[in-house]
Amino acid sequence: MNNYFTIHKLFTAKKNLLFLLSFILPGLIFFSYFFYTKNGVLTVDLGQQYVDFLAFFRNNLFSHPLRLIYSFSNGLGGSMLATDAYYLFSPFNLLLFLFPENLLPQAILIIIGLKIATSGLTSYYYWQQKINMPFYALSASSAYALSGYVIANHFNLMWLDSVILLPLLINEIDRTLRQEKSHLILITFLLWFTNFYTAFMTLAFGFLYLLTQIFFFNRKKQWSIFKSYLIKSILGSFLDAFMLLPVFIEMLQGKAASSANWSWGFQFIPYNQITKLADGAYNFHEMQEGMPNIFIPLPFLLLTILYFLNKKINWKTTLANGLLLLFLIASLFWTPLVLLWHLGQFPVWYPGRFSFVLIFLALNLAIIALNQQEKIKLWQVLPLAIVALGLILFVTFNDQSFDFLNENAQIATGAFLALGLLFIAFIYNKNNYAAIFFYLIIELELVINLVLSLGNLAYQKNYDYQNFVKNTTQVTNYETNHDQSLYRTEKNFYRSDDDPFSANYYGLSNFNSISNQHVLSLLNNLGFVNNSNSYTNFGGTPITDDLFGIKYYILPNEEITPLKEKKQMKYDNKNQRIDVGDYHLQKRFNQLILMKNNYALPLLFLSPTSTKKMKFDPSNITKNQTQFLQAATGNTTLFHNVIWPDPKKINVSSWDGGWMQYSKKRKNKSARLIFNLRPKTNSSYYLELPGDIDDNAIDMYVNGSFVNLTVRDSNTRLINLGSRQSGQRIQIAITLKKDNLDLNAANLWRLDTKKLAQEMHSFKQIQPQITQPSALVIKSNHFSLHKKMTMKSTIPSSINWLVIDNGKILHKNKVLFANAFLSFNLNPGKHQITLIYIPWILIIGLLISLITLVIYIKINKSISVSVNMEK
C-alpha cells in the first residue's frame, strides 16, 4: 500500500510539474527577450492607443467607475461601453492595480507575458488528454503559446484572451460530443466578455469544429448533441447581453456604419502565404499591409501533413478535418471569407486576425498524428521531404520580394525542416528520448523565431511615456483643482491621439476603432486632420477653440534648461498653432506652460438662432468654420481672403497661362518657392492646403520652422502662419518633392481675431455656468430668459441624454446642431438645466442577462431534482 501511495505521489508531482512547465516556459521565453534587449513593450497601437485606455481604466475603475460608461475624454464625448468591451474587460487588466502609475508599461508587459503563459497552460490541459506522451503535448502547448499569431500580435493584448480560451472551448465541445457535463456556457460567456471581436472568430471555429465531429454520429444522436450545444451557446451569449447589446448598437453607429466592397477576388497572391511558414516571417510592413501570421514550428508543420498520410486514422475523419483545414486556409486570402471572419470589415492593419484558430487546428492534427505511434515508412517520408525542399527553395528564391526572408531566416527555416525530417524518419517511435528531443528542438525554434520576428520591430522607450504622463497630469490636476466648470483642454503637440485618457483631461483628439461618424464628419469638414477611426486637434483655429469650449492649452516650456534624456519630455508631432500663444498665460510648470482661452464657450450655450441642418463643403474649410460660428452665435464673416505675394523661384518655372502652378526646370536638382508675406494687421493668418498637397508633395518651412504636412486621409486643412505680426515678414518656403506643384486650390486667409474676441466676449456674457457633478450628470446654474432661445451644445447627440428643465423633461431637437450635437429650445422664463446620461441599451442588456441567469438557475435546479429522483 505504501508503494502505491509513493508511486501516486510521484505521478502527481510529475503531472503538476508538467502543468507548471507549460505555464512558465512560454512566459519565460517571452519575458527573456525584453529583459536581454532592454526594450520597452510599447510599440504601434499598444504605445499609441491601448496604453492610454489601460491608464484610463486604472485611474477610474474604483475611483470614478461611471466614467467607464461615458467620458468626455473619448473624443468630444461618447459612450465607453463598446471601448470597454473591446479593449478593457480582460480579467488580467486587474493586475494593473498592483503597480504604481509610473510603472504602467512594465505592468502591461507582465500582463502580456502572463497571457502567453496561460495560453500555454490551457492548451497543455487540452492536449495532454489527447496523447500518452506528455512532452509532445508540452511541445504543442509552447508552439501554440508562441505561435506566429501570438508573436505578431502580442501588443494586441486584448485578443490574447481568446487564444487562452480556445483550447477550453474545444475541450467543452468534445465533452458535449461525448454527452458529458460541460462548462460550455461559462466558456462562451468568458469569450464574449473578454473580447467580443475575437470571440466571434473563436466561437465560429468552435461551431465548424462541432460540425466536422458530429457528422459521424447517427441522426438521433446528432440532434441531441447539436441541441445541447445550441442551448448552452445561446445561454452563454445571452448572459453577456449587458455587454453585447451596447456593443452592437455602437458598432452600427460607428465603424460598422461604413460598408466594405465585396468581391470574389483574392487579398494577395495565395501562394505567397507560404513565406509566412518561415522562421522570422514578420516585420513592420507585414504588420501594416502583409499577410496573416500562421507560423508554427516546422517539425509540427511536417507532422500536420503526416496526419493526412496516416492509415490508422479513419478516412472520413481525415476528410472532414481536411475540408476544415482547407476552408481556414482559403479564409486567409479569399475576400468573401476574409470579410466573413472580420465581421464584414476589412482589417485595418494586422491581417488575418483569426489565424490562431488555423494554428490550433494544425497543431491538433499534428498531436493526433503523433499519438498514433505508427511506424513511419519511406512512402510517408518522401512527400514530407518534397514539401520541406519545396519550402526551402521557395523561401530562398523569393528572398528579394520579402524583406523578412533574410539570411538568418533562411538558415533557421532550412535547419528546422531538416531536424523535423530527421525526427520523423529516424527518431520518432524508435527512441525512449524521442519526445524530449522533439520538445527541445521545438523550444529552440520558438526562441529563434521570436528573436528574428521581434528584432524587426522598433519599440518606444518607457520613460518617454512616463515623462509625458507625469508632466501633463501635473498640469491637468492643477486645472481640476482651480476650475470646477465643464471645459475642454488641448495641446499644440501630442504623444498619441488618445492623450486625454492617459493625462486625465477632456480633449478633442481621439483614436478608437468605434468612432461617432457624425462627429468625425463634422471635424473633417472643419479641417481637422483625421481618418476613418481617428482625429487630432491639428487644423483648429480660435473659432473652433471658442466653440468647442477649449478653455486651456498646454504648450511646451521652451525656456527651461534641457534635462537628461530620461527626464526630458518629448514634444512630438507639434501642431502649427502660433496663435495659441496669444492666449492668457495661466501658469508655468517644469516642462510645460498652461494658457487660458478666456473666450471659450461652455459645452452648453444659449444661441439666438434656431437649429438647422447645415451643408458643408469639405474643400472649403474657412466657409465651413464661418458657417459653424454663425450657426452658434449669429455673427458675421471673420475670414478674409489674402492675395498671394509673388514668389521667388529657384529652379522653378510657372505654367503658361496657369495660376499658382509650377514645374521644376531641372528635375535632378532642388527646386524651391519662397513667398514673403507682410501682414498689415495683428490678425491670425492661415494657409488653406488641399489634401493632395502633403509631405509626399512638398516640404514647407514658415520663418525657418519646419511644418508637418502629414495627412491621414486627403484632408483639406488650415495651417497657422502667424499671429500679431503686423509689419513683420512671414516667409513661406516650399521645396518641391515632385516635378510639378499645383497650388491653384491653396488659399491664404486672414482671421480677424480682434473682432472675434469682441463678439465672443459679448456672446459669453449671456451664457449660463455649466458644471459636471458626476460623470453622467451635467448641470447649469439658475438663469432667466426674456425671449425664446435655443440651447445648443458641443456634446455629441445620443438617445441616452435626458434633458430636464426645473424638474420637467424637455424634448430634444431632431435636427442636430452642426449635424452632430445635442440642442433643445427654451421658452422665456427661469431655467435650470440638468442633463442625465442614461445608458438605456445597457439597462435592457442587464435585464436580458438577469432573466437568462434566472432561467439557467431554474434549468439547473430541475436537472438536479430529476437526477435525485432517478437515484
Range-by-range predicted roles:
Residues 23-26, 113-130, 135-216, 228-248, ...:
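Membrane-embedded helix bundles of polyisoprenyl
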Residues 52-55, 225-228, 239-310, 315-316, ...:
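Periplasmic/ER-lumenal interhelical loops and adjacent helix-loop junctions
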Residues 53, 636, 640-871:
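Active-site-proximal, structured, solvent-exposed surfaces of multi-pass membrane proteins
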Residues 198, 345, 349-471, 830-871:
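Contiguous transmembrane helix-bundle modules in multi-pass membrane proteins
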